[in-house]
A protein has these predicted regions:
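Short, flexible micro-motifs
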Residues: 46, 102, 192
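Short amphipathic alpha-helical surface patches that mediate protein-protein
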Residues: 12, 119-120, 154
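Glycine-rich, flexible loop/turn motifs
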Residues: 37-38, 98, 121, 149
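C-terminal cap of thioredoxin/glutaredoxin-like
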Residues: 2, 6, 28, 56, ...
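Extracytoplasmic thiol/disulfide redox context detector
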Residues: 2, 6-91, 163-166, 170, ...
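Structural alpha/beta surface segment adjacent to cysteine/selenocysteine redox centers
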Residues: 55-58, 63-140
């Protein structure tokens, strides 16, 4: 009996070790690890459901989600304490990287308001002949001066931090934007409110 019990224990240990070394386990570890600047969560830490969004500030589908779905999602699930949500950086181009750097430069308490502004006004700054000039004009609404705008975009620490988040996202399986991880399960694309309802209601009821 003792030998059988020892064998079962050893087998379970080997299985656990194999799981820890598997690509799926590494992906979950990358997903669970916040970037150097930390995650900015909305909603209570003990919420039953967590949503991590990976997005690019120059992604049209991401802007569509934040314009059409995000307000209703926030009101129904996050403001009511049922779900917590964070937006992580997955810039698809240097302009999106610059936008995320600017969202981080004034501290995490300004991050959500800044990313909301940049998504809402995406067509004004991201798709123009002079996008950097348009971005500079846009962020002055959030308190930047030309000097602080230029200083922010020269900060290697912020650039490196945004890059770390993107690289970890890629290791976790992000290959397009927006990508959502809902309690660790991957969903790609600008999900509608109806699609979120279909996913979230069973998780909240379980």
């Amino acid at each position: 009996m003792t030998n059988r019990r020892q064998l079962l224990t050893a087998t379970a240990g080997l299985a656990a070790a194999a799981m820890l070394g598997s690509p799926a386990a590494h992906a979950q570890a990358d997903l669970a690890t916040p970037g150097p600047l930390g995650d900015v969560w909305l909603g209570p830490a003990d919420a039953k459901v967590s949503i991590i969004e990976y997005a690019s500030l120059t992604c049209g589908h991401c802007a569509t989600f934040h314009k059409d779905t995000w307000p209703a999602l926030k009101a129904k699930y996050i403001d009511t304490g049922k779900v917590r949500f964070t937006l992580r950086e997955f810039p698809l181009d240097p302009l999106a990287t610059a936008g995320f750097m600017l969202a981080r430069c004034n501290g995490n308490d300004k991050y959500v308001a800044m990313t909301d502004l940049l998504f809402a006004q995406q067509k004004v700054w991201a798709f123009t002949d002079k996008p950097v000039d348009a971005l500079s004009t846009m962020v002055k609404q959030a308190g930047f001066t030309q000097d602080s705008f230029e200083a922010c975009l020269k900060r290697q620490d912020i650039y490196d931090a945004v890059t770390v988040v993107k690289d970890r996202g890629a290791k976790a399986g992000v290959d397009s934007t927006p990508t959502f991880f809902i309690n660790g399960q991957k969903r790609s694309g600008a999900l509608s409110m109806a699609e979120f309802d279909k996913i979230l209601e069973p998780l909240l009821a379980g």
